[in-house]
Amino acid sequence: MNPTLSRGGAPSRFVRGRGRGGGAYRPYFYFRRNGRVIPAGGNRQPNQGEPGAPDAPSVPPATRQPRGWSRTAGKRGRNAHLDCSFLRPENYAAPEDGLQVQSIAVDNPRAYSGWRLYFLREKYEEGNELATRIMAVEAYYQRNPHTFDFVMIRDRGFFPLCAAGIKSDAQLKEVWPSLSEDIREHPLRTLGTLSLAMHTVVVNHQLDCNDSTTAMVSTPEQYVLPTPRVRKIYARPDDFVPVESIEGISHSRVDTLFSIRGFVSNVGEPSYSLTWQAFRCSRCQMEIAMRQRGTFQPRPYQCKRSECVARDEFVPLRSSPYTRLSIRQIIRVEESSLNLVHDFETSMPAEMDVELRHDLVDAVRVGQEVVVTGILKLQELGDDTTTGDTSNQMQPYLKAVSIRDASSIKREFSERDLEAIVMINAEPNSFKLLVQSIAPEVYGHELPKAACLLSLLGGKGAETEAINVLLVGDPGIGKTKILQSCAQIAERGAHVSGKRGAQSAQQLGVTFAGRNKRVLQAGSLMMASGGGHCTLDDVDKLASKQAVLLQCLQSEEVNLPLAGAFASFPAQPSVIACANPQRGQYDEGRYLLQNINISPSLLREFHLVYILLDKPSERDMSLTAHVRALHAGARKRARIAARYALKPKMSDSMCEVSLNVPAAGKDDDTIKTEDDNDSIMQQDYDLDKRLEVLPEEGDLDLLPPILIKKFLSYARQELNPVLNEDASNAVLRYFLELKGSCNLDEDVSSQIGAGQLLAIIHLSQARARLDLSHVVSPQHVRDVIALLTESITQTSLKEGSSRQGTRGGGGAGGGAGKSAQLRNFLELTKRRSAALGRRIFEFDELKEIGTRAGILTGFSQLVEMANLGGYLLMKGANMYEVVPD
């Protein structure tokens, strides 16, 4: 028993507080943070009135108070939350959902049965602003039954909400004029209002359906499932905010709505957790919901109703809508923007983590281009379990509220962009201007640049049809610069450098990353899927991943073998690659496969193959002047100069003026060339000279990469050209002549088929896109024929006059038939015999000659064929004699 107070009211040493020997006062419950003792009672909330005030909340009386405690109205009540605001820095922006609620009493009003699903603390007041807005949104949903399927929304648990429809409703605009601003600045509260209105409409629709039908009652013979309660419904807003750049997102705009566009580079493993658990009091039958965190599952220790004194026997409700099992997934989105140009060697596009919940989980796949709308949040880097970062810094992330596939969403161009595109198209030779603007530091090589430009424009089906280009040449010729320039101006590009060895090889296919190897990471082939372009520098050094590349080009998918499972991902990229010769310098006397380390099957997948050689020519003086001007800063990539006037273009193709074709505006049926009946392959048409910059023209005002990127994106998006009758006849004549030129070799002619015909058509359509033309003319086909002819000529041996080609010339010289191989082998053998002065050769010597002739497999069968044909005579064991002519 404590002694009584002494006279005068002086505190005794036995009394708590700052008395004699008692030390500093500490409450019964406290905790520490950063070395400071924080009382569990906390401070009075800013919105809490003084004791005795009219608006002061009433504190329910405690059932049992510990001895010596006198809880007043000013102290923290039973359901009051902790306030640690004094620990926050001065510039702290309180999040909208920062008020943590540990438990709630499910006391929904009669008008809204799902009120506590969306508003945990706010009480319903009839006639206030929130109630009026909810009723107005309900009326909007009921006025548009053709837009909202209430039965499907109840089953799915979410509904798409288009901004165009709800913003244009006049009745809703009168009640809620600031809807657009509220959903942008206060998205959580606004989306909760929109979702609660839909929840109420769905509940009323379900009640109407139950009243109209005869309710079945369970019997001992037949059990009838009870009608489940409607769970929480989520609104998925679309087009409420414009798409913004990830780099422009500021931390000061936390808890506001953002929209970004990009490619899904990483997909994490979904995690499941119980976030809320509903209980029912066994005495008063009141429903209580408690927040669940971690592995420990708390239970109510007292009833939320002040009249009830129950402290135990709370029954968990598994089927209650307030019992929520939350699904969470983290993905990483890489930015896709036409206003940014990245140098893949030194910088990478901006990335942002996105948190998916509920129905949005597993809604995307790696490599998919999406538009994500979400709420900006902050998190500690140390809390990220998908990566190994252990920093104390804060990074922004998006809490997604809606996700859409960006393949069907067109890109928007400003008025300034459209004016620049018109200026480029108004040039009399826009093809030449665009070709010269690609890698201007590389002098010459106009045809390889033109081939890369057509590959970036794609064919008719730009999402599924690819145009693959391979550049082979001596080191230092400028192949890497061309590839880097193509990666910068590609609308959807990925760059892989083979100089990094195994690290680059792992960037091709789909791999697992993260600390626990639970994050699915998209490779370059997946990031360039869907009409994108993957540039591979030194593809011959990626020997370990050439099988992955071949499979992607052939089957248009990337496989991922797993333990006990097998996964495949669709991938349709266009590949622009380069390779160096094995011996350091390209040998024109050897086949293409003997110069580079690429398999024949992979080589056949390239439609265009060009050999870039450093030969002495009359251009060397111009090359010297070009290099000097480049280092002096004279050839800088400037924007379109003032001389680009908005003038009408005289022709749809830059070749029509030089070919004496009637100007645009006349009937297309009258466009006929005087040599239509002659062979197209025999016409004297030098495309390389037409794309070359002449000395009298001076320096061109080259286009910047960002403008080329927008021009190519506009052409791919808005134009889908078709072949007219003249262009179709030109393609057919060239294809028949290409097939007829290989009639002497049956094996080669059998490889010229529909694939090569489709390649010519897709290249012609890409050439028409470059002129912003909706019709493919014969002049467009002529440019494509010039590119194909040059590719076939460069990749064939100088000694052979026949065009040995496969898919558009890509496998030229690499897949010759047995008869062609036999002719080349016998020709080299006779030359070797004449040089040595003898006709007897051993088998190893003949094999070496066959290797020089490009015969890598089946040499024994070839020697046997020569023996049976009488070209070689067997003179003993592994000894053969060359029969002279």
UniProtKB/Swiss-Prot annotation:
<dbReference type="GO" id="GO:0042555">
    <property type="term" value="C:MCM complex"/>
</dbReference>
<comment type="similarity">
    <text>Belongs to the MCM family.</text>
</comment>
<protein>
    <recommendedName>
        <fullName>DNA replication licensing factor REC</fullName>
    </recommendedName>
</protein>
<dbReference type="Pfam" id="PF25051">
    <property type="entry name" value="WHD_MCM8"/>
</dbReference>
<feature type="zinc finger region" description="C4-type">
    <location>
        <begin position="281"/>
        <end position="308"/>
    </location>
</feature>
<dbReference type="InterPro" id="IPR031327">
    <property type="entry name" value="MCM"/>
</dbReference>
<keyword id="KW-0863">Zinc-finger</keyword>
<feature type="domain" description="MCM">
    <location>
        <begin position="430"/>
        <end position="627"/>
    </location>
</feature>
<dbReference type="InterPro" id="IPR033762">
    <property type="entry name" value="MCM_OB"/>
</dbReference>
<keyword id="KW-0539">Nucleus</keyword>
<keyword id="KW-0067">ATP-binding</keyword>
<dbReference type="GO" id="GO:0051301">
    <property type="term" value="P:cell division"/>
</dbReference>
<dbReference type="InterPro" id="IPR012340">
    <property type="entry name" value="NA-bd_OB-fold"/>
</dbReference>
<dbReference type="Pfam" id="PF00493">
    <property type="entry name" value="MCM"/>
</dbReference>
<dbReference type="InterPro" id="IPR001208">
    <property type="entry name" value="MCM_dom"/>
</dbReference>
<keyword id="KW-0469">Meiosis</keyword>
<feature type="compositionally biased region" description="Gly residues">
    <location>
        <begin position="806"/>
        <end position="817"/>
    </location>
</feature>
<dbReference type="InterPro" id="IPR056875">
    <property type="entry name" value="MCM8/REC_WHD"/>
</dbReference>
<comment type="function">
    <text>Required for meiotic DNA recombination in females. Probably not involved in DNA repair and recombination in somatic cells.</text>
</comment>
<dbReference type="GO" id="GO:0003697">
    <property type="term" value="F:single-stranded DNA binding"/>
</dbReference>
<dbReference type="Pfam" id="PF17207">
    <property type="entry name" value="MCM_OB"/>
</dbReference>
<keyword id="KW-0131">Cell cycle</keyword>
<dbReference type="GO" id="GO:0008094">
    <property type="term" value="F:ATP-dependent activity, acting on DNA"/>
</dbReference>
<keyword id="KW-0547">Nucleotide-binding</keyword>
<keyword id="KW-0862">Zinc</keyword>
<feature type="region of interest" description="Disordered">
    <location>
        <begin position="36"/>
        <end position="76"/>
    </location>
</feature>
<feature type="compositionally biased region" description="Polar residues">
    <location>
        <begin position="796"/>
        <end position="805"/>
    </location>
</feature>
<dbReference type="GO" id="GO:0007131">
    <property type="term" value="P:reciprocal meiotic recombination"/>
</dbReference>
<feature type="binding site">
    <location>
        <begin position="473"/>
        <end position="480"/>
    </location>
    <ligand>
        <name>ATP</name>
    </ligand>
</feature>
<dbReference type="InterPro" id="IPR027417">
    <property type="entry name" value="P-loop_NTPase"/>
</dbReference>
<keyword id="KW-0479">Metal-binding</keyword>
<dbReference type="GO" id="GO:0003678">
    <property type="term" value="F:DNA helicase activity"/>
</dbReference>
<dbReference type="GO" id="GO:0005634">
    <property type="term" value="C:nucleus"/>
</dbReference>
<feature type="region of interest" description="Disordered">
    <location>
        <begin position="796"/>
        <end position="818"/>
    </location>
</feature>
<dbReference type="GO" id="GO:0005524">
    <property type="term" value="F:ATP binding"/>
</dbReference>
<keyword id="KW-0132">Cell division</keyword>
<keyword id="KW-0238">DNA-binding</keyword>
<keyword id="KW-0233">DNA recombination</keyword>
<dbReference type="GO" id="GO:0008270">
    <property type="term" value="F:zinc ion binding"/>
</dbReference>
<dbReference type="GO" id="GO:0006270">
    <property type="term" value="P:DNA replication initiation"/>
</dbReference>
<dbReference type="InterPro" id="IPR041562">
    <property type="entry name" value="MCM_lid"/>
</dbReference>
<dbReference type="Pfam" id="PF17855">
    <property type="entry name" value="MCM_lid"/>
</dbReference>
